[in-house]
Structures are given as C-alpha cells and as structure tokens.
C-alpha cells in the first residue's frame, strides 16, 4: 500500500532539516512526500529544493500567495496520490518506525492515531512542557471536546470522500484546524483507532504555530478541579454563550457526515444540548 507524506511549511528553516532527515530515514519508505510552502522568507524553500534534488520522491510546491494553515494543508493533501496519508509538521522529529507501525495498525479503519512526546531545545529550556502519559480514547464524543494532533495521524485517502463538498464554506473551516476536521470525521464514522505508542517527538518552542504556554493549573488534581468549578460558576454567564457558539459549530459540521453509528447520534444530541445558551 502506497503511503504519501504531506508536510506544509512556513518559515521553518531552523528545524526543517531535522524533520526531513527523520522522514527519509523511515524503516518503511514513503511512496512520495508532498512538501508545500506557504510563502516562506527564511530559506525554507531552498532547503526543500535541496532535499527534493537528493530524494526524487519528494515533490515540492510553492503557493503563489500565503494561504494559511487550513488552505495550505487541505490543498497539499489533495495532491497526495497514495492510499494512506501521513501528516508532518515542519519542526518535529519522527520515530524511525512511525510509518511501519502505523500502516500495520490501521487495519480497516479510516484513521490511525499514535502518540507524541514533547521536547524542547537547549535554548528554550525555560519553556514549560507537560506529557500526559494516560491513554486517551478517540471516540466521537471525546473528540468533540478534544482533538488528536495531525502529526500523530495516518489516514486513508478515502476519508476525504466523507467531507462535505463545500467544506471551505462550513463554519468549522474558519473556527478550527484541518486535523480536528479530519479526526472528527473518522471518529463520527467510528473508524478510528489509537495505538499506545510514541511515534513523534513534538518540538515545543514559542515560534511553533500550535504553541501555547502550559498552565500548571490545568494539571488534573482535586485542588485544580475545585478551582475550575469555582471559575465556571463565577463566570458562567460570560463563558456559556461563547461555549454554545463553539459547540454549535461542531454540531453543524457533525450533521454533514453520513454516519449511522449510534455513538454518532448520541454525539449530535450532546452537541445540540451544549449549543443551548441556557442550562
């Protein structure tokens, strides 16, 4: 089965070489690497050209103008011709057997999700990182509240056929990222599997698109739980309308997915309830 890797870049020259090295060193070689740049100005494009010259299966593309994360990734994904597609960020490091493990584990599912462990560079030693070692689940109800990062996923190209044809005009397209959309679709169809293996080292630094400072108050503990309950009660009338809108967007997207799974129907009922602005 052919595996395509899709990597989208934007001013990632500092760490891009390390990521590409981990890709070309995979124990199971990819059929192709689709690398699409979104208007970098720091030498990223030259690095892509250099690797494409050394490895003919790396195909490089440059957007004529900056398109943003979702437009960049979805247009790059459409270029992939493999049966399976793996998403790569520009600044992580893959475990050498990532493709081999995940391609063996996906089975008949539409998506396989692995785990990532955070790390930081020496110059970023003041950054706080936290690794949650608990094994999450990836059913559709959980995926309405949390998501799986794209760099940990391998999915069948078939998954794209379940997305609405007018995806770009759906509210969710401007409210969240591509990996949330893909993960929720696979989970709604109940064809997603999680493997409890670390497949990616995720680099954390302040320049990363997904970086946010880790808040120690969010570590699960009795004291923090009580603190969050108190916060929710105090600011309920401010928070509830925002959360209702948040869940209404997810409910609207969920209803476009052609699924008859019972858990999918339960998720829609839950999202409709969460979308109400009153208790």
Where are the language model's segments positioned?
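Extended hydrophobic/aromatic-rich secondary-structure runs
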Residues: 150-156, 256-261, 279
């Amino acid at each position: 089965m052919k595996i395509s890797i899709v990597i989208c870049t934007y001013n990632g020259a500092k760490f891009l070489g390390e990521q590409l090295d981990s890709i070309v060193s995979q124990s199971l070689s990819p059929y192709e690497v689709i690398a699409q740049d979104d208007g970098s100005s720091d030498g990223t494009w030259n690095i892509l050209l250099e690797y494409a010259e050394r490895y003919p299966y790396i195909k490089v593309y440059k957007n004529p103008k900056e398109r943003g994360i979702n437009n960049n990734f979805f247009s790059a994904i459409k270029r992939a011709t493999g049966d399976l597609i793996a998403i790569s960020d520009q600044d992580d490091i893959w475990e050498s057997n990532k493709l081999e493990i995940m391609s063996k584990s996906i089975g008949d599912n539409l998506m396989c999700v692995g785990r990532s462990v955070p790390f930081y560079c020496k110059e970023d030693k003041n950054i706080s990182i936290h690794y949650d070692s608990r094994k999450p689940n990836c059913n559709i109800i959980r995926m309405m509240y949390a998501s799986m990062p794209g760099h940990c996923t391998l999915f069948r190209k078939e998954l794209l056929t379940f997305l609405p044809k007018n995806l770009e005009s759906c509210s969710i397209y401007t409210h969240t990222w591509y990996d949330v959309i893909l993960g929720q679709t696979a989970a709604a169809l109940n064809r997603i599997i999680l493997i409890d293996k670390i497949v990616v080292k995720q680099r954390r630094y302040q320049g990363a698109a997904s970086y946010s400072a880790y808040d120690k108050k969010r570590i699960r503990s009795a004291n923090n739980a009580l603190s969050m309950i108190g916060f929710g009660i105090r600011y309920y009338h401010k928070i509830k309308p925002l959360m209702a809108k948040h869940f209404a967007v997810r409910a609207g997207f969920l209803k476009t997915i052609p699924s008859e799974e019972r858990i999918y129907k339960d998720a829609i009922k839950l999202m409709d309830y969460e979308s109400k602005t009153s208790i």
